[in-house]
């Protein structure tokens, strides 16, 4: 994207296996071999999602039911299922994304308000670019 390489990865929000939400993160680099930036937040409940661009140029990420379903309104409030939790009620959800070069770097974010911010249980602190 632009002149940068973007590496996507996933992790549980509590940095513990199947605890919290399974999220999508990313890092950027000038060369494919790195060094890469610190981990940045890309989307909540998008873990193991596939990021792709459609024929019209819109970016998307697949999201899956991965854990106990909690309604998005409840998950945003910080409801703790005590185990893996997800707001994806169906087997597959397509979430619109924004991926763009900004000031020599890349900004990735989910456009759906339910997916765009880390939850209250997120162990890592992020500065979110809106």
Task: List each language-model region with its residue ranges.
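Carbohydrate-active catalytic/glycan-binding domains of CAZyme proteins
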Residues: 1-130
């Amino acid at each position: 994207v632009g002149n940068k390489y973007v590496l996507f990865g996933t992790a549980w929000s509590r940095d513990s296996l199947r605890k919290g939400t399974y999220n999508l993160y990313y890092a950027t680099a000038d060369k494919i071999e790195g060094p890469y930036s610190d981990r940045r937040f890309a989307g909540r409940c998008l873990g193991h999602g596939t990021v792709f661009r459609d024929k019209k140029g819109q970016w998307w990420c697949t999201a899956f039911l991965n854990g106990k379903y909690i309604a998005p309104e409840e998950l945003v409030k910080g409801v703790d299922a005590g185990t893996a939790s997800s707001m994806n009620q169906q087997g597959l959800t397509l979430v619109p994304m924004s991926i763009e070069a900004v000031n020599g770097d890349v900004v990735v974010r989910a456009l759906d308000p339910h997916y765009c911010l880390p939850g209250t249980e997120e162990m890592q602190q992020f500065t979110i670019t809106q």
